[in-house]
Amino acid sequence: MTTEHVYSLPKSCRLRKADEFRAVLRHRTVFESLSLRLHIKLKPINDGYARIGLIVAKKIERKAVRRNRIKRLIREAFRKHRQVVQGMDCVMQLRRSVEPSDSARIYQEAVTLLHKAARQL
């Protein structure tokens, strides 16, 4: 494996289709923080790896650069802590606009929500 792919999140760990997002959002198990909302759906026991989908609406964050930055931060938090939420499909959604200087807070909120979901489910 080359070093450029060591720190990436595999495509098998991402929700990519609308039906996959819909299934998680319909399940209605939700955890919230100040800026983020985490939707969780437990998966069958034989399907143990965790997957994540991200929603950062244009209505909330107008600039694509900022939307992509937020998604990268959340994806990195998930990559480092995905063992905590094994067997779950997650959709992380931005609730309100954030300042670029709040990167550390967004990262920490994402980690906190993942751990909170793992403890309560």
Curated annotation (Swiss-Prot):
Enzyme Commission no: 3.1.26.5
Gene Ontology process terms (BP): tRNA 5'-leader removal
Cystines in this chain: none
Protein name, per record: Ribonuclease P protein component
Residue ranges the record marks as coiled coil: none
Keyword Kinase: no
HAMAP family on file: RNase_P
